[in-house]
Amino acid sequence: MRSAQVYRWQIPMDAGVVLRDRRLKTRDGLYVCLRDGEREGWGEISPLPGFSQETWEEAQTALLTWVNDWLQGSEGLPEMPSVAFGASCALAELTGVLPEAADYRAAPLCTGDPDDLVLRLADMPGEKIAKVKVGLYEAVRDGMVVNVLLEAIPDLHLRLDANRAWTPLKAQQFAKYVNPDYRARIAFLEEPCKTRDDSRAFARETGIAIAWDESLREADFTFEAEEGVRAVVIKPTLTGSLDKVREQVAAAHALGLTAVISSSIESSLGLTQLARIAAWLTPGTLPGLDTLHLMQAQQIRPWPGSALPCLKREELERLL
């Protein structure tokens, strides 16, 4: 016997979270809980403003329609990426497809003061990998910060994310301030330039490896082995169903590329599922999931070791 619940939620964000020139004051989303007999599965649907094609309201309408169809015996999935991902996660939990084992390691995210990152990395066991957002300030400043970090911590490898912020000139200004001896310890730089061709040229000219992120969601993108391209960053909330995520990981691995499962600032419930997906599909690769500290609360399932309060399902607004 099938049954389902849908919850709507809103989590206050820390001050200072900016996405594509928009301040994100709250993280808004939905949960679906599917039941079939004794089994239960949860999924999170939280379109990311400025990045997702669909709005929260559109996702809610699509989710409620899909849930009602599922209750009637339908086996299909919704079209919208965030809804397809959340629904497929709920089904994967319900059927036991999604393993419980999780990779709760996360590459620490530095959005501001590099000194904070140095302190966090000092306590990090094993491989030291961190992520730094670049492109928010002057390219020269970004280059200097990256150089300081690589100089201060000799065993550090950095993942950088520019979100296509730079012109070729700005990208070259950044590279100019990174010591050529340190560039090999930049694991990759996500989408440095506004176009793929400019990003490819940057990689060739500087020796700094790049990764595709936004490109994966463009209609003309194909997986290819290319000089200077080392990785793909997969954000499941923006990608679609779990099957589509698995296809992209497999395509990347077939070409010898690193595939990194990455957060779209999901709640703790969604992040714990991403940690399980990472352990399952990309074992041995550190996922990019260090976004919980941007929020003021957790929900339903806590992230191990987090001191943030965790809300229970009874405290959420139920829609169905």
UniProtKB/Swiss-Prot annotation:
Active site: 133, 235
Enzyme class, first EC level, given as a word: lyase
Record's keyword annotation contains Lipid metabolism: no
Pathway: Quinol/quinone metabolism; 1,4-dihydroxy-2-naphthoate biosynthesis; 1,4-dihydroxy-2-naphthoate from chorismate: step 4/7; Quinol/quinone metabolism; menaquinone biosynthesis
Recorded catalytic activity of this chain's protein: (1R,6R)-6-hydroxy-2-succinyl-cyclohexa-2,4-diene-1-carboxylate = 2-succinylbenzoate + H2O
The protein's role, per its UniProt record: Converts 2-succinyl-6-hydroxy-2,4-cyclohexadiene-1-carboxylate (SHCHC) to 2-succinylbenzoate (OSB).
Protein name per Swiss-Prot or TrEMBL: o-succinylbenzoate synthase
Taxonomy, superkingdom: Bacteria
Cofactor(s) recorded in Swiss-Prot or TrEMBL: a divalent metal cation
SUPFAM superfamilies for the chain: Enolase C-terminal domain-like, Enolase N-terminal domain-like
GO molecular function: magnesium ion binding; O-succinylbenzoate synthase activity
Transmembrane segments: none
Listed Gene3D superfamilies: Enolase-like C-terminal domain (3.20.20.120), Enolase-like, N-terminal domain (3.30.390.10)
Enzyme Commission number(s): 4.2.1.113
Organism the protein comes from: Salmonella heidelberg (strain SL476)
A single GO BP: menaquinone biosynthetic process
Keyword Transmembrane set for record: no
Residues holding Mg(2+): 161, 190, 213
Protein family per UniProt: Belongs to the mandelate racemase/muconate lactonizing enzyme family. MenC type 1 subfamily.
Keyword terms: Lyase, Magnesium, Menaquinone biosynthesis, Metal-binding
Pfam families named among the record's database cross-references: MenC_N, MR_MLE_C
